[in-house]
């Protein structure tokens, strides 16, 4: 079974650059305080690291 991470949106995309909004949509997030369980891959980690002020990693699962 693949490792996964649970990502939660903690910031609003209002008045943020379009690139940051697109990154949120790429992670499957669009509303405040929503969570998503995503595969722990380098591409997902990179997207999370691009917008640390908008998302947080809640949990890492095996």
Curated annotation (Swiss-Prot):
BP GO terms, sorted: translation
Tree of life domain: Bacteria
- Cross-referenced Pfam families, in alphabetical order? Ribosomal_L30
Any idea which GO molecular function terms this record carries?
Answer: structural constituent of ribosome
UniProt keyword annotations, A-Z: Ribonucleoprotein, Ribosomal protein
GO cellular component annotations of the record: cytosolic large ribosomal subunit
Q: Which family does it belong to?
A: Belongs to the universal ribosomal protein uL30 family.
> Subunit structure, per the record?
Part of the 50S ribosomal subunit.
Q: Any idea what this protein is called?
A: Large ribosomal subunit protein uL30
Query: Organism, per UniProt?
Result: Ruegeria sp. (strain TM1040) (Silicibacter sp.)
Cite the source lineage: Bacteria, Pseudomonadati, Pseudomonadota, Alphaproteobacteria, Rhodobacterales
